[in-house]
Amino acid sequence: MGSIGEPNRLLCWSIYVTKKPDQSEEDHHNHVSKVNAPMMIPFLKKYGIVRYTVKHNDAHSKPKQAALMAGQPEENVLAYDTVFEMIVKDIESIQTMQKDEEFLRTTIPDHFNFADMTRSKGSLTWIEEFTF
């Protein structure tokens, strides 16, 4: 799980996605849940991804987000429509999946069906969890 001397900890690869400009919010979220996620799951299992989470930001959650961020400058509020999270033991599992020919042929092209790929962003972090 990383270099020598690095603690054994899980990593989280987060991908922040904005829907395509010509796509409705409903179509975006339906495509993510009903087309893309089922397409991703076999690859996630094959390459040992520990957990996969899709977080939706829509007309119901956006006003609540605005209430939580009240008084903050608008640029401080993340305006992404969906956040994908892959929990992994090491980045090699994701890197290997990203080289899989079937994954490249099927899943990657599907991202262009629901995401404005020019605005997608990513972040790799490690996890510290507090359970209570």
UniProtKB/Swiss-Prot annotation:
Chain segments annotated as transmembrane: none
Residues of the EthD domain: 21-117
Gene3D superfamilies: 3.30.70.100
Keyword set, alphabetical order: Monooxygenase, Oxidoreductase
SUPFAM superfamilies: Dimeric alpha+beta barrel
UniProt pathway: Mycotoxin biosynthesis
EC number: 1.-.-.-
Gene Ontology terms for molecular function: monooxygenase activity
Keyword Membrane part of the UniProt annotation: no
Null allele phenotype: Abolishes the production of cercosporin but accumulates a red, cercosporin-like metabolite called precercosporin.
Family under the similarity heading: Belongs to the tpcK family.
Role of this protein: Dehydratase; part of the gene cluster that mediates the biosynthesis of cercosporin, a light-activated, non-host-selective toxin. The perylenequinone chromophore of cercosporin absorbs light energy to attain an electronically-activated triplet state and produces active oxygen species such as the hydroxyl radical, superoxide, hydrogen peroxide or singlet oxygen upon reaction with oxygen molecules. These reactive oxygen species cause damage to various cellular components including lipids, proteins and nucleic acids.
Protein name: Dehydratase CTB10
